[in-house]
Amino acid sequence: MRTTGETVVLVNPQDQAIGTMEKMEAHRKGRLHRAFSFFIFNSKGEWLLQQRAHDKYHSGGLWTNACCSHPRSEESAASAATRRLQEEMGLYCQAKPLFHFIYRSEFSNDLIEHELDHVCIGYSDQLPVPNPQEVVNYRYLATAELEAEMKRSPENFTVWFRICFQQVKDKLATLQQTA
């Protein structure tokens, strides 16, 4: 597997930076590193999903949240999410931190995702202009449609999306009740 030249920020379980490592090496060794998942909703409350490019280093062709990646060492997860959303989906939307979680998942190509994943949300009615190197397709789904599809075909969604979907949904409901 080739290296990318990109680095990830290695962290401890308290999200304190303990160093950096080349991205593919961190995924081969399963080292805990900082990441983010950015969820975008339109004014109808629909979830913006992207289908990952088929040649991504893992989870190619699977559906996931609007944008996910790794912050650079000098930037916050929310700043990185805002930046990467523009790069991947051609959208500008300010990321708002929601929560974070740790997960570990091994893939069939011997890569391991072990991430402290910062979940951010944002709202936009702007239509995406996806970067074809990152994204094959996109779509908007209402919550009920998304839940039905995830129940019917969970294997079509990334592992991190399946892990945090319910918590994102619950936090959104809480935010809407307090608004």
Give the location of each predicted region.
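The catalytic Nudix box helix
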Residues: L48-L49, T64-L98
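Nudix hydrolase/Nudix homology domain
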Residues: E22, G61, S73, I102, ...
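Histidine-centered active-site/metal-ligand motif
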Residues: H27, H33, H70, H114, ...
